[in-house]
Amino acid sequence: MNTMRPRHLNQRGKPVSRPISLYDKWLIGAVFGLLIIGLMMVASSSVMISTKYFHQPFHFLIRQACYLFVGLLLALIVVRTDSSFWEKISMPMMIGCVFLLLIVLIPGIGKSVNGSRRWLALGPIGVQVSELTKLAMIFYLSGYLVRQQEAVCESIFGFIKPMAILAVVSVLLLLEPDFGATVVISGTVMAMLFLAGVKLRYYFGLMLVVVTALALLAVSSPYRVARLTAFLDPWADQYNSGYQLTQSLIAFGRGGWFGTGLGESIQKLLYLPEAHTDFLFAVIAEELGLFGILVVITLYSILVIRGLNIGYTAYTQERHFASYTAYGLTIWLALQASINMGVNAGLLPTKGLTLPLLSYGGASMVINCIVIALLLRIDHENRWQSLGLRPLTA
């Protein structure tokens, strides 16, 4: 139930009798819309590959539903947890993630998939450490900006400290390698620093360093050079380095205005690699057409607008950790979704990033559910603080 009639007194000692909304209905609606579309499209896009490797068509759908169930259970806990708890554990959590990033690089411990060692195998479950690191980085930076706001804005030394952490995390991610996660984390950190009021000369200096470093890394690996070349002209090598992108573009072309119909994709029949993960958006374009694309973009836009509004409201209430956290989480989701859609449409080089709340993936789905729960919790605290009431806790 989204509304209730509080029986508490406000800060002036007067009873509050009018119903208030516990959580943001627009945000909840957008999220559940994306989750429903995601389950439908994972079911559709993975039928052939599930049948080929597991001899039953809904293997990936069942697993995705299980991941979503776990994510929602954890979200119920997070949404009842005070945001100050995450501020207290932000530093230990960051240190723990750096340790896990080191552990995942050890052969025999880290699980290698498609040439990248990104997963820790915990029995039958693979944990992608980079997803947890994104969350830890936002918590750490939010806490640091609260503690060192003046130093970050006025002193180069205060600015360098979080950059050192970012550099360590980026190096460890690139050793996996996970170029996509590095881009998302770096972009999120830069955006949060900009919102915190860092001097422009520091900010643009950082941007220059980061962009230069990423460009050098991109051209230093033959694998990444091949991806860049394929991005610039995928049809020049459509059966090799440009194969995935050309198949994605074919899916977009087949979709037209209203798509071929749910379940009617041709590209998912093992023509388009990673159709249920990194390139799910292409299958959405093929089966649901431009109309489906616009629906997905609209739902993401609602999510982003509401997330930014939650961050701004927390800032006006001088709840700065909650504000920076809400901004960071929203920027992360917006950036990752934009990059994924851009890659699928041929506007950006391939990065290997999932589409938040839609693509198949255990770690990403669970973490995304936690992210949404954090936004809802901050919004809940905003609403109740504005009335002088104590937020609900577990």
Swiss-Prot record:
Side Cytoplasmic, residues: 1-26, 79-88, 140-154, 199-201, 300-327, 376-394
Keyword Acetylation set for record: no
Claim: Nucleotide-binding is one of the keywords in the record: no
UniProt cross-references to InterPro entries, sorted A to Z: FtsW, FtsW/RodA
GO cellular component: cell division site; plasma membrane
Subcellular location: Cell inner membrane
Class of the enzyme per the UniProt entry, highest EC level: transferase
GO biological process assignments: cell wall organization; FtsZ-dependent cytokinesis; peptidoglycan biosynthetic process; regulation of cell shape
Stored PANTHER family: CELL CYCLE PROTEIN, PEPTIDOGLYCAN GLYCOSYLTRANSFERASE FTSW-RELATED
Family named by the database record: Belongs to the SEDS family. FtsW subfamily.
Stated name of the protein: Probable peptidoglycan glycosyltransferase FtsW
Organism field: Legionella pneumophila subsp. pneumophila (strain Philadelphia 1 / ATCC 33152 / DSM 7513)
Encoding gene (name): ftsW
